[in-house]
């Protein structure tokens, strides 16, 4: 077994954004934060609390706080304390006093307004400025939604800011499925749960009467695959996130052990591991027709399949060479090639949404690591090292990874951590107690 944990594993509501009427902003200025492997000096930004209209003071403060937290949390941005500001924003459409922001070394300025409408809708408007070029950075936008969607609108603004400055897609308006755990290590209760990427808005999707493991989002974010022991043995279930209705995968013989599921990029089929006698192989299942197909046939354990973004290939782990290694095969099965080339044991491979890297868990010399490698096995880099790090999951922009970290000892507690693909900005993700097996959703908007 690759891991130390005691379970089977071998290893809404927002309207469309619109350009603000009356603001015909020009082309983006030269401000650009390049994401490289070198030392990064966080980009200083100023974010005055958004103006409030119609009694939206609390919402304006909350939206501003979440946007700032999103940007700071990347490790790429540094917020200049508001008490250092020389200028005060009193009119959303007023000209920017660039010299005042240059004087405090702000490189980016984010201004905004939150309006509470009589119909219960909330309108969030924002503008982004390149301070030293003295020019807007892209168009001003507004987002409209129910008042209780303010957090999503804040994340969406942060995604826009992140994207315009880095040139990469954002990842803030996302959710994370995970396993919420409680109780002693030898009798731990597990529930499937979902939350915003920053730990807010936690919702429990199952009770704790049976063990649940390994949730995986569909490409559309509307369904979750996971493994449950509610029948007494591991079986893959599929759940509708909106209704919380669940069912086991169809066309699977009764009392057949299935686990380690993953959706295809189209969401129309799934792959998973199935135990048949003494052998464990990878199968695919067409969700519309129920057609099941065996993809591997080696006399070994094949598991943890993950599709390439274009759906043409599957990366998986196998012990066919004597210990666990990473292999790639065509999506319809066929000859597999080994891509892991280092020492140690490799498992839980996951293809990056960008298609450029494969993330994995590695065990070597009594330590566990989260690492990345190119899809041909080259450029292997270990991003973390601890008593137990496992189960990477990619942010939708392919630049940040979440994973499970567990502390040693009889009371070892699992927690969710994140790290960027250069190994920087390692931090614990807020969860309501112990948590494991994170799975990142696609962007919601």
Curated annotation (Swiss-Prot):
Pfam entry (one): TolB_N
Subcellular location: Periplasm
Predominant subcellular localization, coarse grouping: periplasm
Residues annotated as signal peptide: 1-26
One Gene Ontology CC term in the entry: periplasmic space
Keywords: Cell cycle, Cell division, Periplasm, Signal
GO process annotations (BP): cell division; protein import
Record SUPFAM superfamilies: TolB, N-terminal domain (SSF52964), Tricorn protease N-terminal domain (SSF69304)
Superkingdom classification of source: Bacteria
UniProt KW Signal keyword: yes
Record's function text: Part of the Tol-Pal system, which plays a role in outer membrane invagination during cell division and is important for maintaining outer membrane integrity.
Family: Belongs to the TolB family.
PANTHER family linked to this entry: PROTEIN TOLB (PTHR36842:SF1), PROTEIN TOLB HOMOLOG (PTHR36842)
Assembly notes: The Tol-Pal system is composed of five core proteins: the inner membrane proteins TolA, TolQ and TolR, the periplasmic protein TolB and the outer membrane protein Pal. They form a network linking the inner and outer membranes and the peptidoglycan layer.
Protein name (record): Tol-Pal system protein TolB
